[in-house]
Design a protein with these regions (language model features):
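Alpha-helical transmembrane-bundle signature of multi-pass membrane transport and export proteins
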Residues: 2-421
Length: 421
């Protein structure tokens, strides 16, 4: 499960604001997905990202089945998914300086090859379950490095502005779609191959991604040589980003809002049984938010100017949570899916936050701030899954989901970005 945000600055000239409100955004503030995909290097990164993302998801599915077949333990099988989130905290904190210390292409290719070796090692016959989990955890440490370096590379391939926002939009849409396609592909592979066969195919996919990146991206030198250890440099960058108040607010908004928004997904299976349906009906619920999110990204990134993207951040954030309060009334499956799609539409706030983070990050720390944003998002989403899942065991789902919605709305209002004068 892999799985991104920021605000913009409004002009104080009222005449400019009126002109913007009255007519379409100027050409300089518009771009299309065709423009973005017309950049060859972005296409390469985009393709490799799809392959790596699907590979990680398929690995989780196959390894979950493999662990369960060996142990018949639901707890250990569930631990596989938990371990996919935990390394983000460690990797993001201790390896966040990678983007500033090593050439991006070298890191991305190295990450894919390391993942190929680790996933390939999982197919060794007779390897004990603790060994499988250790390999999964090690592979999980690579993911935040890969995503952080890729995030830092993107503004160099797509300069900050409309194209960058659209590029980030495409990445988010792929992340949402990969959740659905990846689990389906994993199930299909397991229907054709054994779990070890699926893992072998996954290892080969990482090799393919490495080759695409090696021959499709430019070798960019690092901006400046740095001394000291990687961990110390990473922690210094972490402190620097969080010490900058505007950046800290953006990061906290981008982490806490999604952490609350995942509550209905974390409780999808229990909610399905709560309304009298089999647990497998959770699949319909799980499609709701990703569907809304994809639509929101297309609308916000493609059809709204940068200024309007940033103006709707708070309203869109509140839209994320308003529909979730209706779960207090135990809506049926059809209405619940509609509510979740509307909640997903609220994720339009992310388009505005993308540009804002780029504009706000402290000088010299942009790469590490972008890496931190991605790692923190994945970790807090995982923590949100765990928190709301545990809460659902001890309290009614008709209470837990609305409480998560209220907490999320409070985060939106409390951490709302302040535009520059």
């Amino acid at each position: 499960m892999l799985a991104g945000c920021q605000p913009g600055y409004m002009s104080t000239a009222s005449t400019n604001e009126q002109a913007s409100a009255a007519g379409p955004p100027p050409a300089a503030d518009r771009a299309s997905y065709r423009d973005v995909l017309g950049v060859g290097e972005f296409r390469v990164i985009f393709t490799a990202d799809i392959v790596s993302m699907l590979g990680n998801i398929v690995a989780e599915v196959a390894l979950t089945v493999l662990v369960y077949e060996q142990t018949r333990s639901p707890a250990l099988a569930a631990l596989v998914l938990g371990l996919s989130f935990m390394p983000y905290l460690i990797g993001g904190a201790l390896l966040g300086a990678t983007a500033d210390r090593l050439p991006a292409r070298r890191v991305l290719v190295g990450c894919d090859l390391a993942s190929a070796v680790l996933v390939g090692s999982m197919v060794i016959p007779g390897i004990p379950v603790p060994g499988l989990l250790a390999l999964l955890f090690a592979n999980g440490l690579i993911a935040p490095v890969y995503q952080g370096v890729r995030s830092a590379l993107l503004p160099q391939v797509l300069p900050p502005g409309p194209r960058y926002v659209l590029g980030r939009s495409l990445m988010r849409m792929v992340a949402q779609s990969a959740q659905i396609v990846g689990f389906g592909a994993g199930g299909l592979l397991l229907a054709i191959l054994s779990p070890r066969g699926a893992l072998t195919a996954d290892a080969l996919s990482f090799v393919a991604s490495a080759l695409v990146l090696r021959f499709g991206t430019a070798l960019r030198p690092v901006r400046a040589a740095r001394s000291g250890s990687m961990a110390r440099d990473s922690l210094a960058g972490l402190r620097g980003a969080l010490a900058h108040r505007p950046t800290r607010r953006i990061l906290l908004f981008s982490w806490l809002v999604p952490a609350c928004a995942v509550a209905p997904e974390a409780l999808a299976a229990p909610y399905a049984t709560h309304i009298g349906l089999p647990a497998r009906a959770a699949g319909f619920l799980l499609m709701g938010i990703p569907a809304g999110t994809i639509a929101a990204d297309v609308i916000a990134a493609r059809f709204l100017s940068s200024r309007r993207q940033r103006r709707i951040i708070v309203a869109a954030g509140l839209l994320t949570f308003a529909p979730l309060t209706a779960f207090a009334a135990s809506p049926g499956l059809g209405l619940a899916v509609v509510l979740l799609v509307i909640s997903g539409l609220g994720s339009a706030w992310a388009a505005g936050m993308d540009g804002l983070l780029i504009d706000t990050a402290p000088s010299g720390l942009r790469n590490r701030t972008l890496a931190l944003a991605g790692a923190g998002l994945m970790f807090t989403q995982g923590a949100g899954f765990a928190l709301w899942g545990i809460a659902g065991q001890y309290a009614s789902l008709t209470v837990v989901i609305p409480v998560a919605a209220i907490a999320g709305a409070l985060a939106v209002v409390t951490l709302r970005p302040h535009p520059r004068p």
